């Protein structure tokens, strides 16, 4: 079973002061993690901002990137432009969040997110949301 995972879920699992989704538990129920290509940049941005704010020791970002890479998250490169825009309009989501929703819908996958608006949109579309 495949799980679409967003940057908020990954960050909450790995950052030392964050509380969130237990990806280890989700991994026992899902054999593949996937995300839009955007996750690559979003997660690194979260790390660098967290580091700048002093919440992450210098150098730890590199270790966390290695941990995420070890998850083997499959990055999707083929979103439907029309579907992403339609979902963004329908649910008043950013295009960034609509990318995650479109991928989950296209594959019929569950979605892991801590973003309340994205989770609500996924539920409205009939998807299961891990929080």
Task: Describe the function of each predicted region.
Residues 47-51, 72, 108:
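Short amphipathic alpha-helical interaction patches enriched in hydrophobic/aromatic residues
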């Amino acid at each position: 079973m495949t799980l679409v995972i967003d940057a908020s879920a990954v960050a909450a699992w790995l950052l030392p002061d964050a509380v969130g989704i237990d990806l280890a538990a989700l991994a026992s129920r899902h054999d593949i993690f996937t995300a839009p290509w955007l996750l690559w940049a979003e997660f690194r941005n979260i790390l660098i901002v967290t580091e700048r704010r002093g919440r992450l020791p210098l150098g730890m970002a590199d270790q966390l990137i290695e941990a995420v890479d070890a998850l083997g998250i499959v990055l999707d490169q083929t979103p439907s432009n029309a579907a992403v825009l339609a979902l963004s309009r329908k649910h008043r989501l950013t295009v960034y969040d609509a990318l995650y929703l479109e991928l989950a819908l296209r594959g019929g996958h569950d979605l892991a997110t801590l973003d309340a608006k994205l989770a609500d949109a996924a539920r409205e579309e009939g998807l299961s949301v891990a929080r």
